[in-house]
Amino acid sequence: MSNEAIDNVAADGISYFTPAQDPPSGTGVAPKVDGNPIPKLFTPLKLRGVTFPNRIFLSPLCQYSAQNGYANDWHLTHLGGIIQRGPGLAIVEATAVQANGRITPQDVGLWEDGQIEPLKRIVEFAHGQSQKIAIQLAHAGRKATCVAPWLDMNAVATKEVGGWPDDVVAPSAIPWLEGVNPTPRALSVEEIAQFKKDFVAAAQRAVKAGFDVIEIHSAHGYLLHEFLSPVSNQRTDNYGGSFENRTRLLLETTEAVRAAIPEDMPLLVRISASDWFEFSEEGSELRTQYHPTPESSWTVAQSQKLAPLLAARGAAAPIKAGPGYQSHFSQTIKQSLGESTMAVSAVGGINNGALAEQLLQSGLDVVMAGRWFQKNPGLVYTLADELETDVKMANQIGWGFGGRGKARQKKL
């Protein structure tokens, strides 16, 4: 038996004891046992000043579990169980930059300073595991003031349950679902200016909370996506009509946030590749109503035009392209960037290691998974097993799977 004192070294800079994770969970062990290189999925990626240990990221997952926009222990445990198992980056759910920008009354927010502190707890947990963490900043637009989806997928949160059906906003006064959702108020130019200021203020609060990365949500039919799409944006001023006008708010917001956060902090912008009306059956009611011409809805071609504009403003782009088999849209957008170093990811339906690796080998930089992490918090370990790759596990987990080795030692 050794006479040396063997210390269970603490993670640096954490307010409570937690063992140091060096390297972090999810780090690939290279080379593989057979001598071959490890899959690209488990190679590091650097964006600006942040290095991610692998390329499988946790997508934002709304939990509808906050009160007055304040995160709580549910958010800590939901994210913590995944974070300790090693995604390259974990992204906190859509977080409203204005109170009326929540999807439901139970969404997380960052529209006031008091909301920083509970998010700090989550950030500290991630950093205690040597993991990277991001936050997605969002405004739900005309899809706001709903109830939690397990209660009803198409119900409005009324004033009696904390909703704001009289204060729903959008580019134009067009409801999400006619006869179901409230008819929104078209934002004035002055309100658009305030929105940009509030978005920047929320980003600055995210920096104070300690996040490593910020993501701007411009997908899924929420406010910034609504400005992009002619289906929801029928304005006649500088924020509607032409492609240049419809993309103006997203580009101005991206530029303003980029200028307000540290230079070495990565900024992601999540977009939907398409409204999908362009792929509806020729002659169908959807095609006739929403996509009679190539410019009648948001399309893959327009996403291709947008991506270089985002890159020029210092952003990377996760592309919501549908199930994994449709992720070639992300590849198309990546190719449109030419020599740009902008990182592009595929989002959605990526549920096995072979597909994830195939997408990366085709030129994408990152794959993102959401619900699969919900079902299996150890998804990173599962994908590593599928690809016959060893990855570092959190010390508290890995020692039970053959990770009994010589500990870090410190002489007293």
PLM feature spans:
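Flavin-dependent oxidoreductase catalytic cores
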Residues: 1-412
